[in-house]
Amino acid sequence: MKHTHRILLAAFVPLCFTAVGAQTTPMVEQFTLANGLTVIVKPDRRSPTAAHMLWVRVGSIDEVDGTSGVAHVLEHMLFKGTATTKPGEFSRRVAALGGRDNAFTSRDATGYYQQIPSDTLEDVMRLEADRFANNQWVDDEFKREIEVVKEERRSRTQASPIALMLEAATGLTFTASPYRRPIVGWMSDLDAMTAQDVRNFYQRWYVPGNAAVVVSGDVEVAEVRRLAVTYYGPIAARPVPVRKPQDEPVQAGPRRMDFKGVASQAYVNLAFKVPKLQAADFAGDEQGRDAVALTVLASVLDGFSGARLARALEQGDSRLADRTSAYNGLMGRGPQLFVLSGVPAPGKTAAQVAAGLRQQIALIAQEGISDEELNRVKVQWVASETYKLDSVFYQARQLGSNWINGLPLDADTRLLSKLRSITSAEVQRVAAKYFGDDQMTVATLVPQPIDPKLTPRVAPALPTRHSIDHD
């Protein structure tokens, strides 16, 4: 599953390179309004476009049992109007300005964004500030939209045996962490959810001190400051709710699950609890090195064409797997995992694939990696992130993601410094340290035959608006 791996790796790896040349690097500026709202601005004058993002530090991690999915439902409801905009009017106005907009919900955050001609920034900031402060809708709008969310769950999760297995596996992996709940929510919680549940969540978390506006592109910092003060500044300050720690206890032994689902092939997923990068780790190059070394390890295994997993497990007539993948969760508000997965080749078993995946880790723990592999990962990582800087949206998204995790403005440069200094010995050491049985959860999809008496369910087309970030 190479394509999936690369998407996930991009989600976990923050921006590593701030510009091709330091002398041309636009300065990123951050300031805080009197009401507590953070504003981050990164000018990039190469084209007359801009990205405007509103980040709210609230996601499924902030939900409580019985209301799973409410952060995502609220994201949908933000498009349902204010006292001055009708349902759906927000997006129509952005489109009329020549822009495009969307939103996403993850475990850690909710984000709303517009990609626009830079001379329309004031119009968009006026719209977004109004939506953030004055979202309102009648119960009938909620009743219609909750059915859209339920259908999203049916089509993307319940219609997919692998998605259902991974959902169950996540619940087995985490015991105390809110990460154990699905972002889209349990169907029983969606069935029981009320309009007031969503309004209460909005009132609790959508406060200026829990949000950041990020603007990148063809803009002047002084003008963005003026617009932020004009449109976001009047929003009343309210306390940010106190978050109680929900620390995941140390795992004391392997966890295993067989999940039966209608499928033509088995699938195996191995998750290992690993350290993550935190804000304190950016104080110097010596902190947080294991998390970065683990990300390098994931890339050595599955970060480029012909990487170790593909060579060892997917090639030849006697291959073990049709597909394999590896990724590392580098950072997040909750605990992170290093995940190995694979689909057995014909005649092979999930147990054989699991053993093969672990054998590749053990081989690196015993013998290390070559300088060529290490250099290839570093060059590819830096080149990939540098190329993405052509997108002002990507720049805004990375700055917002860093803010969600409490990282400094120059986190990208500091992370690049860490990456460049990672050694082969460090990759070998983390391969030997973090992949024991006691920190492992193994989930296996056990294929079940299709019942010929049942008509396969064809999911209706869903709106393309909104997305869930599966980080």
Positions of the model-derived regions?
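Active-site His/Glu-centered metal-binding helix of metallohydrolases
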Residues: V70-L78, L297
